[in-house]
Amino acid sequence: MNTPESLKHTKWECKYHIVWIPKYRKKSLYKELRQYLGEMLKDLASQKECRILEGHLMSDHVHILISIPPKYSVSQVVGFIKGKSAISIARTYTGRRKNFTGQSFWARGYYVSTVGRDEETVRNYIKHQEEEDKRIDQLDLF
């Protein structure tokens, strides 16, 4: 098991596997946007004192293994990351500067699972998710 992190009066080890999708599960996370999002997600997480330990962006969903301090709820962090990244994507890739209301890049909701002793299993799952999806797609052809 890893060494717990600490706050002033707390030792903690809170890790979560989180998955979310673009609106309508559109396959929209490609090349330049994928790279841009990867850096942005790490930066946004650090603004909330979180660390992305593992992550993978598929064309139609995002997987992250994230460490979140107990002073923040998972929903606060996910809402912050999804909200700020959607605004940044709109500004950078669609040229919108203001009046962003009414549009969303990400679908509502997300999947979350706590990670404990199975951290290595979750890390491998996230790393190899793309190969697994391709393998399943090939099986579906027959």
Model features per residue range: what roles?
Residues 1-142:
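Basic nucleic-acid-binding interfaces
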